[in-house]
């Protein structure tokens, strides 16, 4: 990570399932992100829009890493066709629709699916063959010269040094030496995108996504 920022949370993406909906509709269990393009899932899946949610970037990273940009366009076009009106602006919306039984399959944050399953909801998840890609949220202090709040660095230091224990209750992935991720939240196929996740790369992937709608 750059020296000017400190990560405070990390999230991974995965395929989320409503087990009751899967059984009722006699749907095949997907094993990959590419599977979500199959015609049998038309009207049965929900994903997020990368123009409004970084959760969708986890899906794009997986597809592009495995298949390259051109094949990803073909796959994503079919995924969006299957999702129809269930392409969501919020990263948590697909999980909410899976919970409610509006769709059988969604793409979302892994730790949320793990928590729902542990709570006894009819929720399961599949770590896709393409990998569980991750994003971090980081904290930094902006130097605004004379307008810099002198307490800003103290607040940032307090969050980094004292907030991680509580943050890990919702974002359980370990980030720092000495932290541990419990076994339920250890993903089956962690991957890292080969390029730095810059604003320019995000805009490039947003453009690719728009071409698939």
Which positions does each model-derived feature cover?
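A ligand-binding cleft/hinge motif common to bilobed small-molecule-binding domains
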Residues: 99, 104-122
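A bilobed periplasmic-binding-protein/Venus flytrap-type ligand-binding module shared by bacterial periplasmic
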Residues: 16-21, 136-148, 167-170
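Short secondary-structure boundary segments
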Residues: 19, 49, 110-111, 171
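Periplasmic-binding protein-like
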Residues: 40-51, 75-80, 87-88, 119-143, 158-180
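Short amphipathic alpha-helical coupling segments at ligand-binding clamshell hinges
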Residues: 71, 75, 137, 147-159, ...
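Extracellular/periplasmic bilobal clamshell ligand-binding domains
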Residues: 179-213
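Extracytoplasmic ligand-binding site segments that recognize negatively charged/polar headgroups
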Residues: 1-95, 99
């Amino acid at each position: 990570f750059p020296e000017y920022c400190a990560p405070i949370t990390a999230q991974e993406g995965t395929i989320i399932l409503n087990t009751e909906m899967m059984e009722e509709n006699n749907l095949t269990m997907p094993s990959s992100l590419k599977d979500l393009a199959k015609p049998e899932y038309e009207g049965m899946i929900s994903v997020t829009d990368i123009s409004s949610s970084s959760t969708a970037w986890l899906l794009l990273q997986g597809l592009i890493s495995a298949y390259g940009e051109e094949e990803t366009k073909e796959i994503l076009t079919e995924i969006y066709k299957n999702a129809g009106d269930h392409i969501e602006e919020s990263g948590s919306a697909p999980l909410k629709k899976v919970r409610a039984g509006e769709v059988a399959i969604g793409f979302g944050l892994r730790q949320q699916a793990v928590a729902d399953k542990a709570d006894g909801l009819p929720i399961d998840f599949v770590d896709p063959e393409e990998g569980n890609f991750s994003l971090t949220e980081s904290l930094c202090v902006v130097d605004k010269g004379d307008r810099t709040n002198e307490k800003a660095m103290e607040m940032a230091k307090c969050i980094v040094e004292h907030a991680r224990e509580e943050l890990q209750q919702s974002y359980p992935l370990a980030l720092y030496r000495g932290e541990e991720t419990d076994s339920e939240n250890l993903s089956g196929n962690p991957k890292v995108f080969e390029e730095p996740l810059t604003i320019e790369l995000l805009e490039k992937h947003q453009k690719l996504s728009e071409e698939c709608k």
